[in-house]
Amino acid sequence: MQIFVKTLTGKTITLEVESSDTIDNVKAKIQDKEGIPPDQQRLIFAGKQLEDGRTLADYNIQKESTLHLVLRLRGGIIEPSLMALARKYNQAKMICRKCYARLHPRAVNCRKKKCGHSNQLRPKKKIK
């Protein structure tokens, strides 16, 4: 039977499959056509993410059904020098005691009108 796989870019891929094929097999066929590794693929049908070990019949996927392909997001750690820079950028600030505006580290007066450009500033509290 024939099914369609729609990507986020709007491209539609046509696959020739059997209802007894597993989701793993479908992902392998997508890899053959598009070059996307199966571990980065997520297939969605009827609002549900399809699990690798199950078959197309388990999800009641019939001929000319459309699956949606999205890519798995990968997280990662930040390099230590970039982490220090991010921490400095996010934590080295002054806070107005009247209106709680965040200001640059060397600020003397608040930039907001609602507190009358107050000079009552404090350093931003450090995250523990």
Curated annotation (Swiss-Prot):
Gene Ontology molecular function, alphabetical: mRNA binding; structural constituent of ribosome
Segments crossing the lipid bilayer: none
Database matches in Pfam families: Ribosomal_L40e, ubiquitin
Nucleus among keywords: yes
Keywords on record: Cytoplasm, Isopeptide bond, Nucleus, Ribonucleoprotein, Ribosomal protein
InterPro entries given in the database record: Ribosomal_eL40_dom, Ribosomal_eL40_sf, Ribosomal_zn-bd, Ubiquitin-like_dom, Ubiquitin-like_domsf, Ubiquitin_CS, Ubiquitin_dom, Ubiquitin_ubiquitin-like
Chain ranges of the Ubiquitin-like domain: 1-76
Cross-link position per record: Glycyl lysine isopeptide (Gly-Lys) (interchain with K-? in acceptor proteins): 76
GO cellular component: cytoplasm; nucleus; ribonucleoprotein complex; ribosome
Gene Ontology biological-process annotations: translation
Disulfide topology: none
Family membership: In the N-terminal section; belongs to the ubiquitin family.
Additional comment: Ubiquitin is generally synthesized as a polyubiquitin precursor with tandem head to tail repeats. Often, there are one to three additional amino acids after the last repeat, removed in the mature protein. Alternatively, ubiquitin extension protein is synthesized as a single copy of ubiquitin fused to a ribosomal protein (either eL40 or eS31) or to an ubiquitin-related protein (either RUB1 or RUB2). Following translation, extension protein is cleaved from ubiquitin.
PANTHER family: UBIQUITIN
Protein name: Ubiquitin-ribosomal protein eL40 fusion protein
Top-level taxonomy: Eukaryota, Viridiplantae, Streptophyta, Embryophyta, Tracheophyta
